[in-house]
UniProtKB/Swiss-Prot annotation:
Gene behind the chain: lin52
Assembly and oligomerization: Component of the DREAM complex.
InterPro entries reported in the protein's UniProt record: DREAM_LIN52 (IPR018737)
Family recorded in the similarity comment: Belongs to the lin-52 family.
Protein name: Protein lin-52 homolog
Gene Ontology BP, a term: regulation of DNA-templated transcription
Pfam families assigned: LIN52
Superkingdom: Eukaryota
One cellular-component annotation, GO: DRM complex
Annotated PANTHER family: LIN52 FAMILY MEMBER, PROTEIN LIN-52 HOMOLOG
Length: 112
């Protein structure tokens, strides 16, 4: 066990005499020049208008976003897997159609 005076020694070893009354840029200089200005450019005051990316969305798109937002993690992963499988199947179908077009010579450029 530690001695009764050991606690005081431990506390005195934790005292820091560092002066922290400087401005934060002096304490934590910017590591990547320009990052602060870039981040500040995206801080918009709170307004009633929707963000630019949301202005082009239709009501069906917003409903889909709400639906995806309400899914659990497992359900969302299933949805993503389904989309990946669909994209893969579409790629296979496109490959077959391109091969078919090649054999039918419909993709060749006309000879001059």
């Amino acid at each position: 066990m530690a001695s009764p005076n050991g606690g005081e020694d431990f506390e005195s070893s934790l005292i820091s005499l560092e002066n922290l009354d400087r401005a934060s840029p002096d304490l934590w200089p910017e590591q990547l020049p320009g990052v602060s200005e870039f981040a500040a450019s995206f801080k918009n005051p709170i307004t009633n208008s929707p963000p630019k990316w949301m202005a082009e969305l239709e009501s069906e798109d917003i409903e889909m976003l709400k639906e995806l937002g309400s899914l659990t993690t497992a359900n969302l992963m299933e949805k993503v897997k389904g989309l990946q499988n669909l994209a893969y199947q579409l790629g296979l179908e496109e490959s077959r159609e391109m091969t078919r077009g090649k054999f039918l010579n419909i993709l060749e450029r006309p000879k001059k």
